[in-house]
Curated annotation (Swiss-Prot):
It is found in: Cell junction, Tight junction; Cell junction, Adherens junction. Belongs to the CCDC85 family. It comes from Homo sapiens. This is Coiled-coil domain-containing protein 85C. GO terms for biological process: cell population proliferation; cerebral cortex development; establishment of cell polarity; establishment of protein localization; Notch signaling pathway; radial glial cell differentiation. Residues 224-233, 329-338 have a biased composition (Pro residues). Residues 164-175 have a biased composition (Gly residues). Residues 162-268, 307-348 are annotated as: Disordered. Keywords: Acetylation, Cell junction, Coiled coil, Developmental protein, Phosphoprotein, Tight junction. InterPro entries: CCDC85 (IPR019359).
Amino acid sequence: MAKPAATAAAASEELSQVPDEELLRWSKEELARRLRRAEGEKVGLMLEHGGLMRDVNRRLQQHLLEIRGLKDVNQRLQDDNQELRELCCFLDDDRQKGRKLAREWQRFGRHAAGAVWHEVARSQQKLRELEARQEALLRENLELKELVLLLDEERAALAATGAASGGGGGGGGAGSRSSIDSQASLSGPLSGGAPGAGARDVGDGSSTSSAGSGGSPDHHHHVPPPLLPPGPHKAPDGKAGATRRSLDDLSAPPHHRSIPNGLHDPSSTYIRQLESKVRLLEGDKLLAQQAGSGEFRTLRKGFSPYHSESQLASLPPSYQDSLQNGPACPAPELPSPPSAGYSPAGQKPEAVVHAMKVLEVHENLDRQLQDSCEEDLSEKEKAIVREMCNVVWRKLGDAASSKPSIRQHLSGNQFKGPL
């Protein structure tokens, strides 16, 4: 194809370069021959051009098909790109929402942690105050117990002195009535009544006045023994004196029953008093050891010598009798009418009434403190605080699992968190 084209081009150049004089000199045959040859060359060129055009058209068609395919691919890619853009926008919105929620949770966590630590500090402060109060009550209880033992020792000395004075002052032919008068003179001051006031039982079924007649020989020489021990003593003042009088009233034996001869020995009475007090102290110690968290208020009071009615009801009957009526005395075999100088059985001593009032004031204060603590937060607020605590502890646990330093810090402060 390239060779005929080159030949035709060369022929046309030759014809175009041939001058007119040369053409006029040629013959007709030469001109016709050259003309046919030029026409043949033109036909060949036209055929060649047609083939080239078909080739170009075929290639153009192929390119058009490729362009259509690329357009389809481009359209699909654009659709995918649009979907990806929408997905990116959606994810960006979620990211913004997540960041906003994370900031809110951080603020909530800081607020919750502050509230929790504030509550923990308040609880620890209250716990320290309660422990201080408990220690003070325990110290006061120990002092009162020591005072009880001291009073028991003084009473034993007084009883021994009174017994010696009574045994020496009733000599001669006083007989059994002088011993009964000495017993009445010993028991009268201990119970709070005047010596010789009211009726007494002489043991033979008849009752006579403790003062006796003026001409009776057995009562004429009887003098009530002194209640103070020998040696200089000053009267108790303030709280110690009131406590001593209250303990004397509580520990005094009940004299509203007649006492047969031989059962009111001062030493045996003192021993029984000590035994009852030891049993009472052991019962208090056992109850204090067995008291749980629900009996914290009872444990905090330290089981003082004055118990409330609810606490008395929880004690055994022997302890109730010891607390309400004083130390136990031997029961008589034959009861007699009560003496006129003593209060009836239903009436409580003044010291017990005063102790009940003090305990009632303590219980009212404790109830007010408990009510004020419960009124600080409602049930809904308590539930919210618990949920906040759970969230904070979960976040602290996640942080501890990811960072060893936080785990070590939490393990070192595990006893400083809220209860």
